[in-house]
Amino acid sequence: MTDTPNQLPPWRGSVSLDFELAADGTTQWQGGARSPLKLLRHFTAGDGRCVMPLLHTAGGLVGGDQLEIALHAAAGSRSFLTSVAAQKIYGSRGRSRVQPQGRWAQITLQAELEAGADLEWLPQETVVFAGALLEQQQQITVAPGASWLGADVVRLGRTARGEDLGAGRFCNSLSIRRGEQWSVVERLSLEQEQLPNPHGMGGEPVLGTLIWIAPEPLENEQLAQLLKGGRADREGLSGTMAIGPLEPGLIARYRGGSSQAARLWFFRLWRRIRAVQGLSEPSWPRTWPFQEAELALNPEPATTATTAAR
């Protein structure tokens, strides 16, 4: 369907980044961005890791908008990418008899990691407004010996305003391949009538997933301690949280009413994953809500709202 004269053309934003290990041990980058995506000033962490914040200057997506992010991490490089703010997906536009729901907004992430690379992708949450249509695709290729850490938190509807997903829909496709084997292949499609299902969202508006593909298989005791610590990190957080092993690495799931709880738990897991690798402890990202930093580092006592699933 073509745009009418009264409609602005959809956004086609993109980011392309290549990370390489420099002679001085720091990670350097090359690439660029196309509006409305923008690369903010990066900085180098104490361990030489390149820290890169991404900004979506349009503030959100509507039906027809597309964002494409392509990442390549060369051998030995270390990088961490996050976003400056939550990604907002507004109600769809372009409704017609042919497309009664309207057009979809699309976000695509492609990442390729060479052996020895370490890439962390931890953006802030995505908020899907009532009536919004979002299709998200993530394709990750990890060479043996590389480390991938990725997290995704999605809120379905602005629940603080009493809003649900309405006529909206969220679709997510995630595939992670390590060498010649698939580590994760997922397809998810959610709409409002499915959310109360106890085998799905159970009436909760927030879902989150954290996946770590380790460079090498962990020893049994090492993995057991990592999972035990991750379960202890649920202390004081509301929602249902589960964590389990991958070959090699781990996967953690969150389902509940608080994107803050998901973010705090994932940050605690991030610290443990860094420690297992013998890497420096991560700092609370500068672009994340600063008032949450103390909660992330010093958990509150457990509450009756916490559900600890394995």
From Swiss-Prot:
Q: Which locations, inside or outside the cell, does it occupy?
A: Cytoplasm
Give the highest taxon in the source lineage: Bacteria
Give the InterPro entries listed for this entry: UreD (IPR002669)
Enumerate the UniProt keywords alphabetically: Chaperone, Cytoplasm, Nickel insertion
Concerning Pfam families, the annotation shows: UreD
Q: Does the keyword Ubl conjugation apply?
A: no
Keyword Cytoplasm belongs to the record:
yes
GO cellular component entries: cytoplasm
Which cysteines does the record link by disulfide bonds? Answer: none
GO terms, molecular function: nickel cation binding
Q: What does this protein do?
A: Required for maturation of urease via the functional incorporation of the urease nickel metallocenter.
Describe the family membership recorded for this protein in Swiss-Prot or TrEMBL: Belongs to the UreD family.
How it assembles, according to the record, is:
UreD, UreF and UreG form a complex that acts as a GTP-hydrolysis-dependent molecular chaperone, activating the urease apoprotein by helping to assemble the nickel containing metallocenter of UreC. The UreE protein probably delivers the nickel.
Q: What is this protein called?
A: Urease accessory protein UreD
Q: Can you name the source organism?
A: Synechococcus sp. (strain RCC307)
